[in-house]
Amino acid sequence: MKFSRSIQAIDSHTAGEATRIVVGGIPNIKGNSMPEKKEYLEENLDYLRTAIMLEPRGHNDMFGSVMTQPCCPDADFGIIFMDGGGYLNMCGHGTIGAMTAAIETGVVPAVEPVTHVVMEAPAGIIRGDVTVVDGKAKEVSFLNVPAFLYKEGVEVDLPGVGTVKFDISFGGSFFAIIHASQLGLKIEPQNAGKLTELAMKLRDIINEKIEIQHPTLAHIKTVDLVEIYDEPTHPEATYKNVVIFGQGQVDRSPCGTGTSAKLATLHAKGELKVGEKFVYESILGTLFKGEIVEETKVADFNAVVPKITGSAYITGFNHFVIDEEDPLKHGFILK
């Protein structure tokens, strides 16, 4: 057998949402910072993302990451998040998956009862505490980058729906956060297709008509995700959500960065205090816990430091190959 590429990856899921973590078999990703590494990967090695995320090795809703050498000397490893549509600066469920995999495969030595992990993403340094029992990562709590409400009460005309009102908040990426009632739908699995269609239309309109720019991170200048929320069905949950991203992908988890953005939004509106309990429910009924640890500033924006808690499970170890004679070697999407 002769292959042009042999790639190793760890598969896991966090509250139902997949994370395929590439740990070997790809070229050196150049860059003096994680944003530079992300840019290099996108401009020079994007065929690896499409090969691993899309069919026949993946699927439309696949999510993944590439584990790299960090740029910050204090970090245990670097991470670049990706999906079927491109790359993300930060991902909460992916962070929980990566930290779990790092502990359970020995990338970071396990220390019981709690192992401290420092991960570097394009959005910044992420610090996590992993609860470890008998060498197994049971739960991950991580401090996300500062989150803040960027624009409140934005209104646009959404074709087929009418005028809708929403907030734009940052939780590692920019989110449009909209109540399900604005779209006339409930957050239920059978509505996933329609919710996705409307969310993608909304995201396109926002990025076409509204100027978006992170105040300190020049490379973050678009709304990448749409977070639709509603009243919960789980007795322990505060709210229920579904997050749509990429090329119309549906997050199965409550979305860690989306939870962070929601915490910041509620705090800015006086609806959630520092240290107050918050539980977010996914479209599947799985849960993340969220908490505001402290208040801070991002340039002129009032911001919060969110802590997100959840669990991930390794589901497999993959050894992918790329055959140059395969006409579909770099993946395809059919939807």
From Swiss-Prot:
GO molecular function terms listed in the Swiss-Prot or TrEMBL record: 4-hydroxyproline epimerase activity; proline racemase activity
Regulation: Inhibited by pyrrole-2-carboxylic acid (PYC).
Top-level taxonomic group: Bacteria
E.C. numbers: 5.1.1.4
Active site: C91 (proton acceptor), C255 (proton donor)
Keyword Magnesium annotated: no
Leftover remarks: This enzyme does not require pyridoxal phosphate (PLP) as a cofactor.
NCBIfam families: PRK13969.1
Protein name: Proline racemase
Species: Clostridioides difficile
Lineage: Bacteria, Bacillati, Bacillota, Clostridia, Peptostreptococcales
